[in-house]
Amino acid sequence: MLLGPASGSPSPLLASLTLPARPLQPPLDLKHLLAFHLNGTTPLSLFPNFSTMDPVQKAVISHTFGVPSPLKKKLFISCNICHLRFNSANQAEAHYKGHRHARKLKAVEAAKSKQRPRNPTTNGTVVSSASPPASGSPGTPQSKGPASPPLGPSLQLPPTPDPSAGDPVHSAGDPVHSELCDAAASSSSSSCPPCSPDPSREAPGPEPAEGAVGSGVNGEGRGEKGRLYCPTCKVTVNSASQLQAHNTGAKHRWMVEGHQGAPRRGRGRPVSRGGTGHKTKRVIGNRGGRQGPSPPFHCALCQLHVNSETQLKQHMSSRRHKDRLAGKPPKSSSQHNKLQKHTALAVSVLKSKLALQKQLTKTLAARFLPGPLPTTAAAICALPGPLTLRPAATAAATLFPAPVLGPALFRSPAGAVRPAAGPILFAPY
């Protein structure tokens, strides 16, 4: 160890020695170790080559290091007409192109068209007849005569055609059209001379009349559609033939008579729809059927209505009708009465069987095995070696008395039951 005076300057010997210098350790900082910035908010700032990465790596990195995006509300696509909700636009598009949506849409449009107020037919006729002549077509040639002053808005009507032409539309005599023509003639007589019939203006005359006829037909069709409904039965039909068939049917007559529900159709049961009157209504209501009431097939004695003469003959030859003629009371052929009879018979049979069983058990219990059981076992053990059934007077008398079981049942057979064997010793336990 070298000792020297303590001085501020280093000694030359120490300066000549090469000592390893200790590196200064700054505080540990992750920012110097990592190749990316920690303060970045997007994966692009963390990874410089993010744009050149594989799409799968991009998705993983953006899912791991990316900023969580705010939750987006899921958009629901729904159909208000069919009351359905879809998960995607493809499902919605397929539904809108389908038959179900088209049918619902047609039904809604039909209901809306029925709810719209209908204009009166007279106003439609006046407008349709007055509008075409007012707006003259540019292609029609004008007459060469002097131009007459224009008529008022209420007087701009097509001139009446020549009666020799025989127009079927105007020969019908529309009252509104005739009144307007009279008013036009009376008012224009003082203001302008009567105009000569112009062929260019006569041409569009029948068209508005035809339009008026068409609108009248449409109005009648709508009214007829509104009438295809039976308020009594609350039934709507599609055509007049269906409505007529419904009015002649049994259900409609049943509801008209004031009954509730549908008529019962029972075979052989009395029907409360009436006799002669019912048949008369049915024949009159039929289209092109026989006129006059048909003969009623009715048995007054049995209060029964049938449909044909053959059924009436079969009823007359039946036992039910003959019993009524003989004065016998009617037999109730209901299933309830039959079941009651069967159950009563079965109960009586069971009661008799139970009584017999009780009596037999009492008799056997009183007469069977009168002595104690050890005495009977000792008597059996006292029998000889071969097991042969021999009549024993005392045993037979004690075990089976004469009135119940006679000794003839216990006769010994001709030979032994089995070959001779050694003696058997009965040892309980």
Curated annotation (Swiss-Prot):
Keywords: Metal-binding, Nucleus, Repeat, Zinc, Zinc-finger. InterPro entries: Matrin/U1-like-C_Znf_C2H2 (IPR003604), Znf385 (IPR051845), Znf_C2H2_sf (IPR036236), Znf_C2H2_type (IPR013087). The keyword Lipid biosynthesis does not apply. It holds the Pfam family zf-met. A zinc finger (Matrin-type) spans 77-107, 225-259, 297-327. GO terms for cellular component: nucleus. Coiled coil: none annotated. It comes from the Eukaryota. Its main location: nucleus. Residues 109-224, 258-295, 311-340 are annotated as: Disordered. This is Zinc finger protein 385C.
